[in-house]
Design a protein with these regions (language model features):
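A short, acidic, amphipathic alpha-helical segment used as a generic capping/interface helix at domain edges
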Residues: 67, 74, 90-99
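Catalytic phosphate/nucleotide-handling subdomain of diverse soluble enzymes
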Residues: 94-109, 120-130
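Short, loop-centered acidic/histidine patches that primarily coordinate divalent metals
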Residues: 85, 112-113
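Surface-exposed, flexible loop/turn segments at secondary-structure boundaries
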Residues: 19, 115-116
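Short glycine/serine/threonine-rich phosphate/pyrophosphate-binding segments
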Residues: 85-93, 118
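Surface-exposed amphipathic alpha-helices with a cationic face
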Residues: 1-6, 97
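Active-site/ligand-binding loops adjacent to catalytic centers
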Residues: 4-84, 122-130
Length: 130
């Protein structure tokens, strides 16, 4: 859809880095709901159907600690209640926006979830340090 509207659009996918994937490590800061785009070891059958064959230009690995920290910051400073994957998407968008070749360009990010499902997780646990 996006390329039909603008063939020059760049699409960047976001994935949890290997240490931040559920079941990928003992890290308590996993990012749920983001399938690995660029991991050839992750079978297509385990991915959501829209991901298989998805046309993107690059993918960015995001660490759980970065997604959690930005999710908490945005909740405190802007009152926007983000979930884990939304924090990851926003973190990746800031990486893309900081690239010199993107100066003056519009960066659009889709925030795929809300923080409501994560109230009982480490994302919003005040005693858990990022």
């Amino acid at each position: 859809y996006f390329r039909e509207k603008n063939p020059d659009v760049k699409i960047v996918a976001v994935q949890a880095d290997p240490t931040s994937r559920p079941g990928g490590s003992e890290d308590p800061q996993t990012i749920d709901g983001i399938a690995p785009f660029g991991d050839p070891g992750f079978p297509d059958a385990a991915k959501a159907p829209f991901i298989v064959g998805f046309d993107y230009d690059e993918y960015i690995d995001v660490k759980g600690e970065d997604a959690y920290a930005l999710g908490r910051e945005i909740a405190q400073t802007d009152g926007v209640f983000l979930g884990q994957s939304a924090g990851a998407a926003l973190h990746a968008a800031t990486i893309v926006a900081q690239r010199p070749e993107n100066a003056g360009k519009n960066i659009v990010v889709i925030l795929p979830d809300t923080g409501l499902r994560y109230l009982s997780t480490n994302l919003f646990n005040e005693d858990f340090e990022v």
